[in-house]
Design a protein with these regions (language model features):
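Short beta-to-alpha transition helix within the HATPase_c
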Residues: 1-11
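A short, flexible helix-to-loop-to-beta junction within the catalytic ATP-binding CA
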Residues: 8, 44-52
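Conserved short strand/loop->alpha-helix "switch" segment adjacent to the catalytic nucleotide/phosphoryl-transfer site
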Residues: 15-35
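Short beta-strand/loop element within the Bergerat-fold HATPase_c
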Residues: 54-66
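Glycine-rich/acidic phosphate-handling loop/turn and adjacent ATP-lid/helix
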Residues: 66-100
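Glycine-rich nucleotide-binding loop
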Residues: 78, 122-129
Length: 136
């Protein structure tokens, strides 16, 4: 996560974060790193399409009602790419066959751990909320 936050700062993205991992989350470190890495890559990509004065990133990772909440919100130009099935795609590559790979991986991890995900693609802000059940 440190490398991604450094990349965001290098790209003049203003960052607000609140990060607190409870002891009783049950997501493997590898899956958690993959999930956060993909989310931050998408947020940084979206911000880099904007004027430097509009670049914002908000990260919240914390316990919430017996769940682990991951919330990522970033500035956006409001232009989104959707696949034939209506799913959001990312555009980090010019190869159309590779669009949406990160989002596919995010969805796989959420499903693997019985989580819930919600994408909110708005005009100036894009946000992702993910909830995972915590162990008792």
């Amino acid at each position: 996560m440190t490398a991604k936050l450094s990349k965001a700062l290098d790209n003049n993205i203003s960052i607000k974060h609140q990060i607190h991992f409870p002891a009783n989350y049950n997501i493997s470190d590898m899956d958690l790193c993959s999930l956060i890495s993909n989310l931050l890559d998408n947020a940084i990509e979206a911000n880099c399409k904007l004027d430097m004065t509009k670049r914002r990133l908000q990260i919240e990772i914390k316990p919430y009602n017996n769940m682990l909440l991951l919330f990522i919100s970033n500035s956006s130009n409001g232009i989104y790419l959707y696949g034939g099935n209506g799913n959001l795609l990312t555009t980090k590559t010019s190869n159309k066959n590779e669009h949406g790979i990160g989002i596919k991986r995010i969805n796989e991890i959420v499903k693997k751990y019985n989580g819930i995900i919600e994408f909110d693609p708005a005009t100036e802000i894009f946000s992702v909320s993910i909830l995972f059940p915590l162990d008792n």
